[in-house]
Amino acid sequence: MKLPTLKSCQLRGKRVFVRADLNVPLINGTIEQDFRLRSILPTINYIMEQGGKVILATHIGRPSAVGRAHLYDQALSTKNLCPWFTTQGFTIDYEADLVAAHHKSKQHFNHILLLENLRFYNSERESNVNFAEILSYLGDIYVNDSFALSHRNDTSITLLAQEFDDTHRCIGLLMEKEITELTKLRDNKTDDLVILIGGNKIKDKIPMIGHFMDPKRHPNLKAICLGGGIGLAFLKALGYEIGQSAIDAETLTLAQKILTLAGENKRPLILPLDHRVALHGSQDLMIVDVSHKIPEHGTCVDIGPRTLQAFTDELSKAKIIFNNGTMGIYEQSACRLGTCGILGAIAQAPGYSIVGGGNTTSAVYACSLQDKIDFLSTGGGAMLAFIGCHDPEKDLPAFAALAR
């Protein structure tokens, strides 16, 4: 990819509009996890070191006007982020009014100007040209450092980029790193790969799974290990009883198609051998082998020890390891043995590890392994889209807007 980069821009004396993804989990106004905030720091520091003024824009959550007259929600205000930036040594000016922000954008170049949650404006989600023009007045240079929104058509992601000429729009350092790291995986035809996919939302992951099913793209694929809800869908498609775990008809059909494709292309799918099962009316978990019938009143909440060992054994074969999705209901401590076990094995494996996805990243932190993964992506759906699409520069809206 040949997108313009931050280091190719002249920043001194310029107002730099940075579209970031600071969509961090907030509980009562307190940041629960600051991974995405820390990920943007190299870009912010570089701009300030080069003499530029940082105008920082983001969204948080999905504001809704249901039950209220407007989209504003104090719980989702970017004002909640100000104390964090202060603890990092920055002087931050928060401004909710865009007219006032325009005046402040020309002042105090050693301060960060933080705009209010862009999704408090209906126009942000509506691809609104007028809103893009208004935002463009706040900066001389546009920087997209929001990889996690690369697959979205939000105004600040696409139309705003078009308000700046080719020499005044670029990707930030985080975006550049994401592209570099994920390209190692996406376009790799030489290194031995092991892919671990969990979680649910099989429909969202079909293009990515299809990408790895192509033997011409990845002739050295050693295994695709499927756990979590996706693993259950494939077991169901093969006729196994999975208890109360619900798999809808569309998901089942998709799983059957992938199984057929895997057989035709001789792709090595590794499915769960056992699960930890919660029985209705009991707080205890039991381990059930898939060769046995999971009780009708039982729910699979995690992979079992045999599955963990089987997946771990595959990791030793890989030079590159990719994990997206959890192996169970990791939010509950009793149900995270599989997820933490897999992530721990990835951290200890000799291969280069790439892990991503919203829940997967949260699980990495829950298992205290954030410093032991080689690359932790900020992307979820964007990461899946980047890997699974034909040409990211044309197929992902953010990249297409910057490349034109």
What is the meaning of each model-derived region?
Residues 1-404:
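Active-site loop-to-helix "anion-binding N-cap" substructures in soluble metabolic enzymes
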